[in-house]
């Protein structure tokens, strides 16, 4: 099985894609494919742990379901499922994509959320 994981230098480099149309100062977007939910267990486990550790950072948290239509700004940020994006100042500062272990999701995302405290 092909594993597709993208880490942006410990999630510190800003991605070229922006969320400008969304006006997100700080936010977390989880792109979910409900037809392949079994592949997303590690993401849900990581999200539960992250929400427990950083409850204040989940004020602007949204699940983006693959089978639904969304604003073009949300759609332009990602086209791979599952994926977890962390947005700061309308830029993607952390992106984990594809099948990943819980720790491979937790580490980069925690590093970014820790900076927000």
Predicted regions and their residues:
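Sec-dependent signal peptide recognition
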Residues: 1-4
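Local sequence-structure signature of Cys/Sec-based thiol-disulfide redox active-site neighborhoods
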Residues: 15-56
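N-terminal leader/targeting and pre-domain segments
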Residues: 11-24, 106-117
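Thioredoxin-like thiol-disulfide oxidoreductase module
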Residues: 45-100, 104-116
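C-terminal motif of bacterial Sec signal peptides marking the signal peptidase cleavage site
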Residues: 6-10
């Amino acid at each position: 099985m092909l594993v597709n994981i993208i880490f942006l230098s410990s999630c510190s480099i800003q991605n070229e894609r922006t969320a400008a149309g969304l006006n997100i100062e700080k936010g977390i977007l989880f792109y979910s494919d409900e037809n392949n939910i079994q592949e997303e267990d590690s993401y849900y486990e990581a999200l539960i742990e992250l929400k427990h550790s950083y409850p204040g950072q989940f004020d602007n948290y949204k699940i983006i379901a693959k089978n639904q239509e969304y604003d073009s700004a949300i759609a332009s940020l990602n086209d791979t499922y599952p994926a977890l994006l962390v947005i700061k100042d309308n830029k993607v500062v952390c992106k984990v994509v594809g099948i990943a272990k819980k720790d491979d999701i937790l580490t980069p995302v925690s590093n970014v959320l820790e900076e927000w405290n």
